[in-house]
Amino acid sequence: MLGNLLRNKTSSSGFEKSSEHSDFSSVVPNVPVYCKAASTGTTKTAAGALLDTAVNVEKPSEMLSTTSPPILDHISDDLKLKLFGSRDIPYSRPIDTLQNNGGLGTDKITSINEKTYAFRILIIEEAGQMACRNNYRDIFDYTTSKISNSMEQIRPSELKEYIFGSPVRSSDLTQCDKIRTIPNSDLVLITRIFYYTHQYNRIAISLCIPRILLPVVAESWSSISSWLTQTQKMLIGFLTKNRIMQENTGNYSNNSVIKLSNIDIRTHYPKEIEIMVQTLQKRVIPGLRSMSEIPRLFLYPETFKEFVHVWFKSIFNWIEIKDGPKLGFLPLLMAMIISDYRHTIRELKTSKIVILSGNMVVANKLLFILSALLEPKYKGQITIRRENIRSDSSAVSRNKSNNNFVDKPETELSTLTSTDNLLSRTENNSNHNCNNSNVSSNSIGSPNFHSLRKGWQIPNRRNSNTSVSVSSSESLAEVIQPSSFKSGSSSLHYLSSSISSQPGSYGSWFNKRPTISQFFQPSPSLKHNESWERLQTTAGNMQRTSSSSSLQQATSRLSLTTPQQSPSISEYDEYPWMGTPGSPNVGDVSHAPPLVKNISYKFPLKNVELKRDCQRISQDDLLDEAFERICQPSLADLNSTYEIFPGNSSYADILTTDSDIDDGLMNKPLELLPKYTMYLTHFNNFFQLQACPAGQESESRITNSMKIDLLKADYTRSLLVSLRSRDIRDVALKREFTGNNNNNSNQNIYDENFVGKRKYVLKQKTRKIFSCGKIGKLSTSLENCVNFVENSIKSAMMLYDDNGIDSELRDSEALRIFSSLVHYCNAG
């Protein structure tokens, strides 16, 4: 609730300012940052990135990309509703400033604000002269840009009242942290005030950031507080060294006051200053931007039947298209999350689930399936937007007339969602030839067929032989391979490779639709070593991926856009390319089979209306209800004994009542969404569930992030799912201490006041749960969970295949099966 109140006070005037250019070193690589010492007024270019010396894992080239470009433009509306519960998600804009339609446009001004990279560091010391007007000394002043901006326009002398507050001293030497907004500006001031030895010698560390980041300050306070503590220790170390130096020279007495103003910290301690700045620039600020700008997944309530129907149909499509009759990849992955990671990811903040894939559409579909098994889910009511049935029917008729769709029975389309866009199955070869003559000129990639103009496109190098490869007698769920590779002499090579594929494998072009009994068959086990291996503390050189799309990926990182890769043979099994919106025209329409009719109007989640932004759900109704109950309480709301104390001239009437916080109150809808997100162009250390491009670079970033997590914990864990190689790995990394120095065994090494050093080694343990189509060695509990998941999916398949069952009974049974999966560990 505090975040909502803070957000409502945030002004939107600063968000609408467009920047013609940006010279921030965080945005543009190899641009120097400028560090200015207030005492001398000189500028010098900062040295290289010097970060934490405990575990040297970061390099300047590995700075996390946290800018959220309009990547949602490449996602269909149906998939947006699955992942986020809304078609429109505003970037860096409070909910109370949204338009009446519940969303914003995708223009660059409202989506991206590059000035959120800017920040300012101020270190100010009180001179101890109460009667003097100039009672404060500027020790250090740093900003991210040499260009004059709103942060530099405010002089430090104008900030002293906001930093130190009242000149009245407290009786004890207390330390305080303050967060406040600066009037008539779009800035937030975060300040820590502490003392060294004297009451009248206060020191302030102030961080000035754009007010657009205020809603995520509370969530990211642990990283901000850690940076303030490190900076405070650094300044105290400077003062201690200066005091020891004065004691050795005989210039120190009991009445002497050690001042930072007597130390030129920029000249004497350049390395420490660089560590302070770069830690803020490469860790804290990217974390704030990630929390603010990257959209988070919305976990639907488990009692929302429309979501449950869509979720089961997504599972059926994945198994039929991706897994094949014998693979069992998805049931094993679901069982791994249900039995283990569902609880681990909530209790262990350093645990992560990462999907590695070169196809954004595939990864987002799998994220939707897996996120439904995680907690915490939304427990409030979901608003369903009403619409005119007559307008829907007219829209459907227009779609049929424009696209000339072939009518199909309702039962044949029951397992398809509107985002799949698969080609329909022909009844036989004769009907196939007859229907081809009646197909209209609208192709798969035409705007009439897809609702989006921007899409995940295959590079449209067209030639006369471009066509769609479709096997005879194939079903609706078969993988349709695009013939976007070169024709000519190489065509026989690809044809022979497709024919040589085994007819039952998940990558075969000629795989027939399996029966329900063929979906779940045991796969051969894979033995491996599960012992802990010692890991080097220093990271090696990062290896670049050698895929054909690496050059385009590198270009897309600089342009902050989602990489659009050309297909390769190893990526054909990741999902049908026909399911991507805005695909180019493929082949001659006279040889293409008829299309499935557009069933987007039957998508169960199409009328979901959720007010949210990137990180929070709007709960204005709950706030209004709570304030009404406080201001106008009723006897029913009190529900217990109460007492009223009459007021007097000093205070108003006071009502006291018993507070009984039960489980029902604690399970109220959560405003802040969990740190689960979608497919990102780079791996992001600040999210626990995500997808990113496959390659050595992503795996290196994941390993480095696990080492960074060990700076504040002794154990971290990640579940890596590679869709390209069909690989599931459970990677655990822990830190074992080998020695004990300074007799600090009774202190917590992660305490901010701990100053000792202990030797340690990093050990890594990797379990191959699934590799190369084979299931690894599983525990008994995991095997039981896999069997339970398979039986549940079988029951759901038979439930949805039964056309004679009542709709209400189907809804209740589907909810029961889904609830048994979600609460499996509690029941078992």
From Swiss-Prot:
Alphabetical UniProt keywords: Amino-acid transport, Phosphoprotein, Protein transport, Transport
Q: Where is this region: Disordered?
A: 1-25, 423-444, 538-569
Q: What residues does the cDENN FNIP1/2-type domain cover?
A: 310-712
Q: What biological-process GO terms show up in the record?
A: amino acid transport; protein transport
Q: Which GO terms describe its cellular component?
A: cytoplasm; nucleolus; nucleoplasm
- Stretches of Low complexity bias are at 543-562
Per UniProt, residues of the dDENN FNIP1/2-type domain are: 718-825
The segment(s) forming the uDENN FNIP1/2-type domain are 114-302
Q: Which residues cross the membrane?
A: none
List the InterPro entries: DENN_FNIP1/2, LST4_longin
Q: Per its UniProt record, what Pfam families does this chain match?
A: Longin_2
Task: Provide the positions where the record notes the PTM Phosphoserine.
Answer: S401
Q: Which PANTHER family match?
A: MYND-TYPE DOMAIN-CONTAINING PROTEIN, NF-KAPPA-B-REPRESSING FACTOR-RELATED
What does the sequence similarity comment in the record state about its family? Belongs to the LST4 family.
**Annotated function:** Involved in extracellular amino acid uptake. Required for the trafficking of the GAP1 nitrogen-regulated general amino acid permease from the Golgi to the plasma membrane.
- Protein name stated in the entry: Protein LST4
